[in-house]
């Protein structure tokens, strides 16, 4: 890859990082959490985030990678781009200032880094960039075919659902509106919301699927089996991702089981939308 092409890919990654982190830039609760969030939990978020970004680089890196080291470097580059762009944007809109304590500055940047890093990695696909030589290299064709096979595998689908769920839920979890909704809905409304979330996830996973993927999924078993293995498993991952983020942002403290369940159900609703759409974004080049 030439320097000009690499610079162009970095530019796309920068745009993707800002675009994906934009909701958090404009969220007042995020500004407060940068100061109040437990630093140990933010470190935990980074520890969980990094291997997921390395794995995501395999599916959607912003440059062509050929081995584990390349994917690791890709992930670190995405984190660096997301952190740098996040710091600049927060500084421009007055959320950061040199007078603030260093811990507060680091906390605010850390919160926007995860969605920004995802955006940096997905920018190549979102901006429809096609690298030169991808169609002319037979070895590249074999590699692409192998990657497509992996992307269609069961665990790859679950992984991509988890990434999408974490990204969307992270943009909602810090807000007070999410807590307010959970308090004002009844148990029956919570149950209805959970069922609607399951239905939405199932529709997103199977609606407008490519014919080969439909045949592959149906070949895995009956439609009930597919519903359990994909949709129910996906919703469970969305719920776990929601619980993890609620814990990261201190929403689980002094909270009863019933209230916590409602928090999870409410946060899982946007999470399932991200889970269902994540595979569509990564799988676009197969169309």
Residues covered by each model-derived region:
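Transmembrane helical segments that form the transport core of multi-pass membrane transport proteins
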Residues: 168-221
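Alpha-helical transmembrane segments of multi-pass integral membrane proteins
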Residues: 11-23, 78-87, 111-124, 152-175, ...
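Interfacial helix-loop-helix linkers and transmembrane-helix boundary segments
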Residues: 32-38, 60-74, 98-103, 182, ...
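N-terminal signal-anchor module of multipass membrane proteins
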Residues: 1-51
């Amino acid at each position: 890859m030439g320097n000009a092409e690499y610079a162009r890919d970095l530019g796309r990654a920068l745009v993707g990082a800002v675009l994906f982190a934009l909701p958090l830039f404009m969220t007042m609760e995020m500004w407060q959490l940068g100061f109040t969030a437990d630093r140990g939990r933010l470190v935990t978020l980074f520890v969980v985030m990094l291997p997921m970004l390395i794995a995501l680089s395999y599916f959607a890196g912003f440059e062509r990678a050929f081995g584990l080291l390349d994917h690791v470097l890709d992930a670190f580059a995405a984190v660096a781009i997301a952190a740098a762009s996040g710091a600049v944007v927060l500084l421009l809109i007055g959320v950061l200032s040199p007078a603030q304590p260093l811990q507060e500055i680091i906390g605010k940047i850390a919160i926007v880094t995860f969605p920004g890093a995802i955006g940096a990695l997905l920018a190549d696909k979102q901006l429809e960039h096609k690298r030169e030589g991808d169609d002319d290299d037979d070895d590249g064709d074999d590699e692409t075919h192998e990657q497509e096979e992996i992307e269609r595998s069961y665990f790859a689908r679950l992984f991509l659902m988890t990434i999408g769920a974490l990204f969307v839920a992270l943009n909602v979890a810090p807000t007070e509106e999410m807590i307010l909704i959970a308090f004002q809905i009844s148990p029956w409304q919570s149950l209805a919301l959970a069922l609607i979330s399951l239905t939405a996830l199932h529709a997103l996973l199977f609606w407008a699927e490519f014919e080969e993927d439909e045949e592959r999924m149906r070949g895995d078993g009956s439609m009930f089996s597919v519903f359990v293995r994909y949709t129910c498993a996906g919703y469970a991952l969305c719920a776990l991702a929601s619980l993890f983020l609620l814990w990261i942002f201190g929403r689980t403290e002094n909270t009863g089981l019933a209230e916590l369940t409602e928090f999870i159900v409410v946060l899982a609703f946007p999470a399932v939308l991200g889970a269902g759409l994540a595979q569509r974004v990564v799988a676009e080049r197969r169309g």
